[in-house]
Amino acid sequence: MFRAQQNAFDDAVAKATDENLTSENWEYILDVCDKVAAEESGAKDAVAALIKRLAHRNANVQLYTLELGNALAQNCGPKIHRELASRSFTDALLRLANDRNTHQQVKAKILERMQEWTEMFASNPDFGIMEQAYMKLKTQNPNLQPPSKPGKREITEADRQKEEEELQMALALSIREKPSTAPHPQAESSASAAAAATTPTGAASAGQAQPAASQAVPSGTSAATVSRVRALFDFQPSEPGELQFRKGDVIAVLESVYKDWWKGSLRGQTGIFPLNYVEKLPDPTVEELQREAQMEAEVFGQIKNVEKLLTLLSTRSSEPNVQDNEEITALYHSTLAIRPKLIELIGKYSQKKDEFTQLNEKFIKARRDYEALLEASMSHPAQPQYGRPGQPQYPYPGPGAPMGYPPGGPQPDQRYFSPRPQGHMYPPTSQSPGPRNHTPPAAAPYQQAPSHPPAQPQQHTAPDAYPPQHHRPESTYDHPQELSTSVYDSPVEQRPPYPGAQIPAAIHQHFQQQQQQQQDYSPSVYSPDESKPPGTQQVPYPATPAANQPPPMHQPPPVPGAAAAPTPYPVNAPGASYQAYKPPQGGPASNPASFYQ
């Protein structure tokens, strides 16, 4: 009749802070947060339910209640902040922290949460009650506050040398212990000696290992002799690269980074942590491993009893009083004793499962990176170093260069033009007109063509600009003579040669094919232009069809008579000396047309 009104949040908060939970159930926690945000008086009712759960004597319930309050503070806004900073809630926290029966871990968690809430509410002066309560608890319990983080001092060379020596000593001891692993009476003593050798704190036996583990890591201990450490306090990283952990976490030690900071790995995360926040865990001895294996065997041996109990309960569920059945009662009590061990094994193998999963993910990532690099290297192979080397261009040798083969020895069968003597390498631009529009002067003598013109002119393409191979006699007026020409060609070309890099590829290929088909060439000698000064000569270019030559602009030479045949044009035999051109002797009245008949 006079019972207090039932709080709508009691059931939801009790469900989220159940003592049978092995860890925080965030599904239930978020359900409470959603319910607080949906109702007008949800913040006040939720905090009232939290105060009730803080009075529970179970330490797990108290820890889950503090975690639920922190989740509400982060998700439900100023309304819940006002209720958390109220006098009733802070007094409940102080009362629980000052109780001598409260677990030490619960007291440390209360101090940690009050510090976070003080920093969270610092912007609003109306929530100063939380700060006052935090300072009061901090003053009354100075031992609850975690130690300050040490400074990050660089490791000296002497420290690294000492760490290396300790590592070599530990390796030598481990090698020395291998023969003693056989079952004989000295097995236990050797294991204890190994633990004492690798533990500077002096734990000499399995019985002393547990007290030694409760001590913090000494400052002189190196990471080479320690493989695992256990967290003594919760650590929140304040700088990038620091490892976050909670009290009780076992951290795998990797290496020393600073003087009082080590690098470790926990739940797939790698970072540095301070040594005064952790304690050293010695490697498990043979007795500890045997004890752990025996405990696991006992737990797995009770599986049959659990299944039998479930079968009996399902078949005899219609009986009114189950307590009268002695078999069911005995099975229930025998299986109830293994529950703490089962929870411990669940936590152990859950952590191992997470570690193996993270290791598998790292391996998969490394394999994918390797395959990507391998495919990239195969899709872009290195260019071969062999092949036809590019031939240098030698249109004219420089001053003082020897006349003959280019550097590197003779080249394949290619004919070329003899170089000009030193002197006029290129025509002066101020005295010579454009190569396309240049015509010989009117006073220049006409050059006589061969007496027997070919029946069918053969078209020639421009040769490539590769360096020539064979020499031929030079003309008396240093004009290069042309080879393998069977039509009337001008010894002085009227256009400059192509540069080596600008010769069309089709012309170059056609000229090479023509050189392979023609094996024997007869050089023809032409008369040089005697009236033209050397300074006005253009750079020659080989073999152009006669149809492209301009008509002569001067008088032809006289012909001696109608019956008289023109003097044949001399042809040099291979190896013969150069024969200069001699004009035929004829009168000025001879008919010039007879020359072309």
From Swiss-Prot:
Organism name: Aspergillus terreus (strain NIH 2624 / FGSC A1156)
Domain UIM, chain residue ranges per copy: 162-181
Principal subcellular localization: membrane
Name the UniProt record assigns to this protein: Class E vacuolar protein-sorting machinery protein hse1
Sequence ranges assigned to domain SH3 in this UniProt record: 224-283
GO cellular component assignments: endosome membrane; ESCRT-0 complex
CDD domains reported in the protein's UniProt record: GAT_Hse1, SH3_GRB2_like_C, VHS_HSE1
Gene behind the chain: hse1
Amino acid composition bias (Basic and acidic residues), ranges on this chain: 151-163, 471-481
